[in-house]
Amino acid sequence: MSDIKVTLAVEDRAENQDTLSISEIVPRIVAERKSFVDVTEESLLEEIANCVADSADDNVKDEVDEKPDESPFDQHRLKLLENVKAAYNESALALDFVSLLISSVRPTSASTSMSPHLKTHIPVGSLGADRVPAPQVANEPGVGIGWKIESLTNARDRLKTCASRLRTEAAKEKTYWAGVASIAATGEVLFKVRNSDTRGLGIKYGFGDAGSKYRDPGIGVLKRSATGTVDFEPKEEVQKKFVRVTIKSEEGEVTKSVSNVYTRDSKPPTDPTLAAIHETRHALFEEELFFEIAREARLLTSRKVTVADGAVTVDLGEGDMVVIEWVEVPEEPTTTFAPSLANLFVLALRLLLANAHRQQLEKMRTPPAPLQSKGGPNPNPPLPILRPLLAHILHKRLVSRARRSLYLLSTTHSGLSFEITTNNSTDKESSSLGRLMAAPVSNLKIKFSDKGNAKVVIPSPLQSHQSMFDVTMFKGTSQETVTSHTGFHELVELEEWVRWAADRSEPKKSN
């Protein structure tokens, strides 16, 4: 079969002379023989004789080549048939042998598969077989003992491995729970984590229980490390930044004071896990502080408070400004408190945020108010952090300007005298924080010789619904008979009124 060749080549019609037409044969003859003038009868006879001799030689060669009797295909076919016949004979002999052997037990079933030749020459059931018992293996007790010893050895090694692992795990658990106990002893709030993906105890390092409503509740997990120590992992990543206050003057060209205090623990814990918890708590507090300051600053744009480039800028007037930023913690933060103006300012901001948390906690404990319409007040207003400080600073500057103006007027008017007093807080607000949260109010008493006196109330500058200067004029030296009551929104208006009242109170000069 391998000698049979099949080609897919296209037959060239020009090579087959039997299919050529006269118009195709004549040009070929002219190309081969040139002109017919040179063709003679003798040359044609000689050429025909040569062609006959060549064809005779080719026929002899073809007869010699076709002499073999059989092709390789026929040889392989005959060999295959011989193998098939041999296999058939062997299978027939095997079937007769098995049938004759079974005939001693089941004659009817065996005779159906026996060949006719076997049934004729050999009677059914003449071949039988007996079972040969297998030789019994001698019972060697040493083999069983060896297997038992090997099994006991493997069990001993596995038990030793398990005991060692349990001992290591017990030591790690002891270390872990000792660390958890030391953290719980410091007053940290621990709770069970009900999450299949997380194994460990939860810890609250945020200020949700203190009244904070910040987006990050401050929840972490105390996990056991590979060595058994306690690892603290916050649920949400907290950036290690802090609030820095810079006080500038001369339109921001000169820096007067910069806060540099970040670490608020007088004695930082020696436990690294507890130190990480405190550090994350401080960072979360600073993050919430700057968030609330920026949120509150958007409502104070009319008071020259701007939020730009990640900083809150408060213009205090007269070239002074306060810049509040949220910056990265330095590699070596300052641990000592320096009583600079910027440090006191940022300390007041932190105290005001803590006080706002306390107020929110008290509000959550009170019964809720009746349901209101959708047009009611904002249910989550900004916390009062920047406004109390800004109110006291602006009020103090306003009172100082009023004092300077009245002092200049008193030098030109002999009968003019004044006294400025600041209202003291009540007993409930006697602390520094209470005085800071209370709205600043100052009283200005002006005496115009013996003809009259005036009482000027200077409220908080942030209260836009009130006049900047509430003036009440009295007759004589007492404050019983009110002659006039008015209000001014600018210090210039108050100066003009005081000058006018002082001129009227002075005795007229005789000609």
Swiss-Prot record:
InterPro entries: Mediator_Med17
GO molecular function, one term: transcription coregulator activity
Gene Ontology annotations for the cellular component aspect, listed alphabetically: core mediator complex; mediator complex
Intracellular or extracellular location(s): Nucleus
UniProt keywords, alphabetically: Activator, Nucleus, Transcription, Transcription regulation
Pfam families associated with the record: Med17
GO biological-process terms attached to the record: regulation of transcription by RNA polymerase II
Disulfide bonding pattern of the chain: none
Primary location: nucleus
Family classification: Belongs to the Mediator complex subunit 17 family.
Function: Component of the Mediator complex, a coactivator involved in the regulated transcription of nearly all RNA polymerase II-dependent genes. Mediator functions as a bridge to convey information from gene-specific regulatory proteins to the basal RNA polymerase II transcription machinery. Mediator is recruited to promoters by direct interactions with regulatory proteins and serves as a scaffold for the assembly of a functional preinitiation complex with RNA polymerase II and the general transcription factors.
Oligomer status and interactors: Component of the Mediator complex.
Name of the protein: Mediator of RNA polymerase II transcription subunit 17
Source organism of this protein record: Yarrowia lipolytica (strain CLIB 122 / E 150) (Yeast)
Name of the gene this protein is made from: SRB4
